[in-house]
Amino acid sequence: MSEENVQEFVLKEDCELRFAAGDDSDVCLELVKGYAEIFGTELLLNKKYTFPAKSRVAAFTWKGATIELVGTTESAYVAESTPMVIYLNIHAAMEEVRKKREEQAAGNSNKAKGPRLLLVGPTDVGKTTVSRILCNYSVRQGRTPIFVELDVGQNSVSVPGTVAAVLVQKTADVIDGFERNQPIVFNFGHTSPSANLSLYEALFKEMATTLNAQIQENDEAKIGGMIINTCGWVDGEGYKCIVKAASAFEVDVVIVLDHERLYSDLSKELPEFVRLTHVPKSGGVEQRTGQIRSKMRGENVHRYFYGTRANNLYPFTFDVSFDDVTLCKIGAEQLPDSCLPFGMEVENHETKLVIMEPSADIKHHLFAFSRSTKADENVLKSPVFGFCLVTEVDLEKRTMSILCPQRTIPSKVLVFSDITHLDDQIKR
């Protein structure tokens, strides 16, 4: 790279280098001197980290550092005011709770349960980043927290349109984030809870039940606690979802990012034992347009099938006969009361399982492989094995071509997702 694309920044303690990579250029970061971290993951001295075009990154130092950037940046500056001390204090408070509960449970066969923290706030206030920082700090403390992702629009554990959770056993990769090994994933199939509120609520309650059962067999996960990220819908029904999620996951800490009214409302609604804290957003958080959000969802689906630069994946493409699988979806049209027999109550159409007939309309849609062996009510309650992408539909031959991580389909029950993706076969 040319000489003019090299920038060196000297950071004083408690400062942060914020930069945005250009639209068409990678940016290489190197910690030349001192100590620094990116979203809670420590940087290695003299190691080069290459961030792809359009990356938004913040490198923070507690003790001072010299950092070199090579490549074209859209912006790059040092910020002296950051909320990192607040995040560290939240982590310290969580660790104090863990230690106290461990002491209280000493000699008790019923092992201690760690703190459960819910992050809430409107869109573009940095909830996902704070979640990552707190998870990383917990891991560096020797803990293994569970990260729960309830943001179905910008999911950081699985594909968009899912409710997901993963046990965090190592700090996030500086560039690629957390490993996505053996996540628990429920298929919601939409990018906003408003598309099907009953289903969304049912799924996060099912997730809470599933995690509560699993941690009984894993003492480290139990004391590690949970860090739960939510979507940015905080008004009306979105607010009700926050309150219900806090109850379902039995949270004892709620962090409200940059929304004083939400903080005030929750302080009146949540039980007294829930510790509520209002935190300002970082000055480095940027607003994302609808176009950017859509592009990020596409990149997330692409990553699911093809991996990342550092960890390439090689999916399979093959044909599946419609006669060998059952296509279904959750949610049906609501029938008016006048269409029902006398005395019969209307069932919840939003959580009703519907068998789908093959059609050309399923092309470019994701389908989830259900763990349920039959297309029945268990589909709603079951996590999924994974996802496939329908790339072609041949109604005459009654087949569809799919992009699939596995060589063969792991389930014959395929659940529709409204998430679409045009597979361009180009590795980013």
UniProtKB/Swiss-Prot annotation:
GO terms for cellular component: mRNA cleavage factor complex; nucleus. Keywords: ATP-binding, mRNA processing, Nucleotide-binding, Nucleus. ATP binds at residues 16, 56, 124-129. GO terms for biological process: mRNA 3'-end processing; tRNA splicing, via endonucleolytic cleavage and ligation. InterPro entries: Clp1 (IPR028606), Clp1/Grc3 (IPR045116), Clp1_C (IPR010655), Clp1_C_sf (IPR038238), Clp1_N (IPR032324), Clp1_N_sf (IPR038239), CLP1_P (IPR032319), P-loop_NTPase (IPR027417). One of its GO terms (molecular function) is ATP binding. It is found in: Nucleus. Pfam families: Clp1, CLP1_N, CLP1_P. It comes from the Eukaryota. PANTHER family: CLEAVAGE/POLYADENYLATION FACTOR IA SUBUNIT CLP1P, POLYRIBONUCLEOTIDE 5'-HYDROXYL-KINASE CLP1. Belongs to the Clp1 family. Clp1 subfamily. Required for endonucleolytic cleavage during polyadenylation-dependent pre-mRNA 3'-end formation. This is Protein clpf-1. It comes from Caenorhabditis elegans.
